[in-house]
Amino acid sequence: MKVSDDLDASLEQRADYIPTEKLVQETATDSVLFATVRKALLSSGLKTLVGPRGCGKTHMMRYAWLTCQGDTSKPFAVYVSFNKYYRLEPLLVSRASPPDEFHAWALGLVVLATYSSLSYKAENATAVSELEAKVGLPRANLETLVSALERNQPLSAEQAALSRDISVNRVQKLLDLACSSTGRKRTVLLLDDAALTLTPTYLIEFLDIVRALKSSTIAPKASVYPGTTEYSARFHAGQDSTAIFVWLSVEAAEYQSDMDQIARCRFSDFDQIPQDVVDLLRFAAFGIPRAYLTMLQDFKERPAKTTQQTLNQVVEAHLNARLGEFRSIARKVPKLRELISVGETVLNGMVRAVKASNTDSTVVQLLVGVPKEDLTAIVQRMFQLLIEAGLVFDAMEVKHGTPERIYQRFIPHGAALLQS
């Protein structure tokens, strides 16, 4: 498969590219994990949705937002994507007060998304105009401000004044007014692509904004990546927020049924695909629905060869893409180059260890244990990078032996195990 074809196939499986009308029919609503996450997204309180790229965070957020639009028994929902955050990186060196302008950009996107949610129903068009007048944050002006910040353009006097006027208090007031106008009692704020991993300075600022927006009537939900998400001195995971993990372990009891439900929603001929193919690609997907869908699509579209040849090529292409993405971190953040290199070496060592442990065993063993005392800060950082990239699954710690020792357990990527 060509690189361009691989990209096209991946984009087809991204929830960002699924039209709203198809989102519902392509959602596995009976999935155990999905039901848990959907409930958390619509609940009160601040939650972080934790999982690597492709595990369904965007899909779940967009679906939760959509189900709230026509159901007044549910909260007023606002969906915001921050996937263009990297465009603000130049501001860190070109502006005198980049955090202030980042605040204006982030809060501006929340306001614009609120207007969009309110106007989703045509009958609410006048409510948006009234809201703009009440809070003094005109939609058109905000759009030009956000655009200027994303293009690193100098702000006009009017835009600079508007950027100073956008405060957390004003945005909270707007959210409460919008919520009230729809007859709802509270708002869920679905903040997607909130990890901002390549710009830690902005991530810290962003999480402070999220924490500040939280109120008795506003419940922010932020999607973040596992492993590398840094929390600010004022944002404490576990105290300020509850983490909801959306990455399903290949060892979970519901793994097969959940993954296959997702595939069945996307492929009408899923049940005609040979079972051995499904089983292998499901394992190779390593709990990432987008990977599963992309590999199934790749298998279906490849020129006819032997099934085993085709499977090997599909899994190899997927693994190479994942490793390529992991290696690209070293180019984007040069100071991490050595950690990335060592991380790949450790991944390969874990794969060899798992393979060796299963040579003469009748029970498949996927776990690799690392003594907790060996997890120095730098070693932990290396594992965090592997986890964020979805190459290693954190299976939590366990206590063993006498005297008792604590081991951190990890599972190396399924595709790497299959290709070893």
Write out the residue ranges for each language-model feature.
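Conserved beta-strand -> loop -> alpha-helix junction used to position metal-binding or nucleic-acid-contacting
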Residues: 75-84, 244, 310-321
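A short acidic (Asp/Glu
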Residues: 60-62, 88-93, 198-204, 230-234, ...
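A short, basic N-terminal segment
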Residues: 1-47, 52, 67-74
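Amphipathic alpha-helical "lid/sensor" segments that cap RecA-like P-loop NTPase cores
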Residues: 274-335
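Short acidic, S/G/P-rich loop/turn micro-motifs used as interaction or catalytic elements
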Residues: 56, 194-199, 393-394
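P-loop NTPase nucleotide-binding core
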Residues: 45-48, 52-185, 226
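The catalytic "switch" region of P-loop NTPases
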Residues: 166-190, 194-286
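C-terminal leucine-rich, beta-strand-based interaction scaffolds used for sensing/assembly
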Residues: 82-83, 315-420
